[in-house]
Amino acid sequence: MKNNQFGRIRLDRTTELEELKNIHFIDADLLADPKAQLKDFLKRSCLVSNSEATFQQKLSNLLATPDQTMAAFFESDQPLTLEIFILLELQLLQFEADTDYQIEDPLSAISKIQLPELDLKNFETSADVAHAWYNLLTTHTKNGEVYLDRLTQQGYFVSFYPTTTKPLFFNGKAQAVFDPHQLIREVVYVEAPLDTDHDGQRDLLKAEILRPAQTAHGYQAPVLYTASPYNQGTNDSYGEAITHNVDVPLTEKAVQKISKSDVTAEPFSQTLPAERKVAGMATKASETFAREQPYTLNNYFLSRGFAVVYAAGIGTRDSDGLRDTGSVEETISTTAIIEWLAGNRRAFTNKTDNLEIKASWSNHKIAMTGRSYLGTLATAAATTGVEGLETIISEAAISSWYDYYRDGGLVAAPDTFQGEDMDVLAAEVLSRKHDAGDYLGIKAHFDQILKRIEKDQDRDSGNYSKYWDSKNYLNNVKNIKADIIMVHGLNDWNVKPRNVGKLWNAVRDLPINKKIILHQGQHIYINAFRSIDFTDMMNLWLSYKLFDVQNGANEVLPNVIIQDNVEPETWNTYQDWQAADDEIREFTLQAKTLVDRASETKNEAASFRDSLDPEFFEMYKNDLKHWHTDLLNTEHATNGKNQMRNNRLIFKTAQTKEDWLIDGTPEVSVNVAVNQPFGMLSFQLVDFGDAKRLNPSPSILQPRSLSGSFDWRTDDLREFTLQNAVTPWKMISKGHINLQNRTNNYCVDEVKPHQFYDVKLELQPTFYRLLAGHQLGLVIYATDFETTIRGNQELLYSLQLNQSHLKIKLAH
């Protein structure tokens, strides 16, 4: 395995000693003898030992040298050496002898596993031992947590619980000294400046709060806030019932010559009813809850002095209002919670008594967390500049809803959600439907909203419009004041990388701190990965942003961290992603090949069709993996004859002589004609070459092994591992375009049958290492069974190859 720690800070020895005292590894002074000091550290960390005999038994299970136990070592006159300490460290960190390290040569494992190096050669004093112990406590175990967190799970900080009144920090990070079993759980109803259900009253929004017991006695906690429309339940069958049929034909669109101003959303306005009249003040909530739908990263911080708030927003169970995916109202309902937490909005104990309750326990510093829709709402909130929001950690977040459900003038579904759209998602998260009595009063109005969304989303055209512009958070990035950490999968075909790519470019020059972490996963969380200290980094960051701990987090954490797609457990740092100084490589299409654009080319043409026999159309529709295999397979050996052989064109470079680090947005330009007055093209950039690649999904290494607190909620330890079998290809990026949207996503151009047009588009941004000896391929086709509508029409496409090109950028 490889250890990658970015959230670990280096401190001077004086500070290390003070911090060791703060967490009770040292009482007043160090012991005189280095060996005695090490034994004392071990005894304090042996949490299962209640007697000297038990402790000696544990020491007998540890080796000091290849032929001596730690118990025997402490009885001997042998001095403590670096080799002895490192061998002990490797055992305490759960590494396995003969697998991860050699007992005879423990020092070589430090560089092999990428553990922090210890700047000692000899242990001359107990201060040297303390320095080494501090180093050990802040080093990751084999199982995805620093050693101090491992001790924490075993109960190290339980004795701190009765006397804890404020956070405790070690190595710049908050520690688990708050008893998570004594959390205060309460519900409040925040009055939002909205009336989306038009009942003549401002919408009340349910918020579920978990906060340390100490907040009842004057301690003020920072808040991790997760806005999750799924939090109060979903209507899966309802959404499935109104999912759109995608087996429909592509049609000709009326020519439309308009400007950007014609598709710019009108400023939001509304008429609001008056605020509720306050009938009195309350200091305690009148409602509680048993168990929320948690995010495991939030769970980790509940024992570290943070409060956590979950709110589902308008139209969800126990809240007022109605859902409208991506709307301004949805953003306002998100920021209303922040405003209450920051002391700038009212909330009530319930929906009838009008008893106001304040967040007196909050320190008015809020961070937002969450993935997908949750991270999307964090992004939306940040673009308002709302007071109190200090930072967001947005994972797999949408930055423009058009880029989620559309691409290049086409309906383009998120991965595995063919037929979903803005209306379907709104229906799925209208959890007020779960309460029949509540739903009775809003059903008719919500039906009207769904009809309006269906009309405005305009699946018939796929064009960008005022509707989509009102759901484009990129329009408001200038308002962002909160610092941002973005996390996204380079293989996320649900919320595609364009969303984070555009946001990263948009905030690059803003006067805020911004970081980005790109992993090789799909639509996933990465906080429980073994090879990267994501949770530690977020602890360092949140301690800095919400507790104002001067730990240098902004300088310590790299601006760009990207997981390698070739070597497992490898994460590299960069100054930028989609960097301006990347090297440009351009290729021209020739018969089945991609050649350097500067080389001499021939006037060649190639064509492909888009129709399939009904039998094979149904086969591919019901077996997308089979379709994708046949699309990329040039051997024509999948289940006999490859039915896609005439439905796509594949162009490959020569085998590369060196590794290429493809960075940013590949660009394709083709000279194309079609036999109808309409058409579409799809493209995939592909790595062709035999290799054992990373599995698409992370493997569970140890189930329920991580919690970060004693006797607390657990998470599975995960990691990307190599596939057992060699595979011949890997898709790097993809893109789609309607031939009538050659100018942009909102202008509609004429397409005359059999007339050639220049069509340009950008594929999804990426960061990909193409190994030496592999070939870079461009696959051109029309219907994408995973993404586009599937009309199975008699369309024939022709390309002028020497007028068609691919441009990529290579990182230095």
Swiss-Prot record:
Catalytic activity: Hydrolyzes Xaa-Pro-|- bonds to release unblocked, N-terminal dipeptides from substrates including Ala-Pro-|-p-nitroanilide and (sequentially) Tyr-Pro-|-Phe-Pro-|-Gly-Pro-|-Ile
Main location: cytoplasm
Subcellular location: Cytoplasm
Repeat in keyword set: no
Entry GO terms, CC: cytoplasm
BP term (GO), one: proteolysis
The entry's keywords: Aminopeptidase, Cytoplasm, Hydrolase, Protease, Serine protease
GO molecular function annotations of the record: aminopeptidase activity; dipeptidyl-peptidase activity; serine-type peptidase activity
EC number: 3.4.14.11
InterPro entries in the record: AB_hydrolase_fold, Galactose-bd-like_sf, Pept_S15_Xpro, PepX_N_dom, PepX_N_dom_sf, Xaa-Pro-like_dom, Xaa-Pro_dipept_C
Top EC class of this enzyme: hydrolase
Active-site residues, Swiss-Prot/TrEMBL: 372, 492, 523
UniProt similarity note: Belongs to the peptidase S15 family.
Subunit and interaction comment: Homodimer.
Function field: Removes N-terminal dipeptides sequentially from polypeptides having unsubstituted N-termini provided that the penultimate residue is proline.
Protein's recorded name: Xaa-Pro dipeptidyl-peptidase
Species of provenance: Pediococcus pentosaceus (strain ATCC 25745 / CCUG 21536 / LMG 10740 / 183-1w)
Lineage: Bacteria, Bacillati, Bacillota, Bacilli, Lactobacillales
Gene assigned in the entry: pepX
